Amino acid sequence: MIIKLYKIEPTSTLTRNGTSQAKPKNLISGKRNCGKGRNANGIITIRHRGGGHKRLCRKINFKRNEKDISGKIKTIEYDPNRNAYICLIHYVNGEKWYILHPRGALIGDTIISGPEVSIKIGNSLPLNEIPLGTSLHNLEITRGKGGQLARAAGAAAKLIAKEGQSATLKLPSGELRFISKQCSATVGQVGNIGVNQKSLGKAGVKRWLGKRPIVRGLVMNPIDHPHGGGEGRAPIGRNQPKTPWGYPALGKKTRRKNKYSNKFILRHRM
């Protein structure tokens, strides 16, 4: 399948159409610098990270625990800490919270959480009250802990079966997983779909995001990478690609075979 990249012109942040700049102070938890990829001793543990613009942390309500209390979408905002947009909700009891922006939700729409609410985009309710075939996001794995699955921009899981105390869901990765029917989920798909198909426009945008350039191992010296060295444009000289530390790369399974959650996975991700 051919994926078309949409170039952003101009390259400034003025192209974020339809977002608001309002920032309620009680929902900002402080500043956060981009991670440098270092541990406590200053040693690089994750490569290609560093720099980046300072960020303000928004308090996102993944639990959606205002049961049977309706709220209205006041703003749709850009969040530098995620690809998805967020929207500010004003509840009738005076509470204000940020939630992930569901695709298709508009300013002025009303949302609500609870076990007996209607199946509407943005509403949150337990899986046992949701009909089969519904697209969902912000899925809980543990009841009451808050949504942990399908939270990226454009992500959506599908409810395909319910049996006993468990529901079977198809996750965005293609994984089929059992989740308790008492866990909550939000109806609809996460907004800002297609963000991964947009060209950033210039290299500087990548640096604003805290990502540094990636150098191929083939052009390094042998002391720096297993693929390095040779005369001229030489091949890697190995049966399969290796990581900088000599371990197999590109397809090596890294998940533990005896992980506790294996019993909840009907089919692993593709």
Swiss-Prot record:
| Gene Ontology molecular function, alphabetical | RNA binding; structural constituent of ribosome; transferase activity
Return the Pfam families for the record: Ribosomal_L2, Ribosomal_L2_C
Q: Which keywords annotate this record? A: Plastid, Ribonucleoprotein, Ribosomal protein
Q: Where in the cell is it found?
A: Plastid
Q: What is its main location?
A: plastid
Superkingdom of the source species: Eukaryota
Per its UniProt record, what InterPro entries does this chain match?
NA-bd_OB-fold, Rib_uL2_dom2, Ribosomal_uL2, Ribosomal_uL2_bac/org-type, Ribosomal_uL2_C, Ribosomal_uL2_dom3, Ribosomal_uL2_RNA-bd_dom, Translation_prot_SH3-like_sf
Q: Where is this region: Disordered?
A: 221-245
Q: Could you tell me the Gene Ontology terms of the biological process aspect for this record?
A: mitochondrial translation
Q: Which SMART domains match?
A: Ribosomal_L2, Ribosomal_L2_C
Q: Name one GO cellular component term.
A: plastid
What family is reported?
Answer: Belongs to the universal ribosomal protein uL2 family.
UniProt-listed PANTHER family: LARGE RIBOSOMAL SUBUNIT PROTEIN UL2M, RIBOSOMAL PROTEIN L2
Which NCBIfam families is this protein grouped with?
A: rplB_bact
* Assembly description: Part of the 50S ribosomal subunit.
| Name of this chain's protein | Large ribosomal subunit protein uL2c
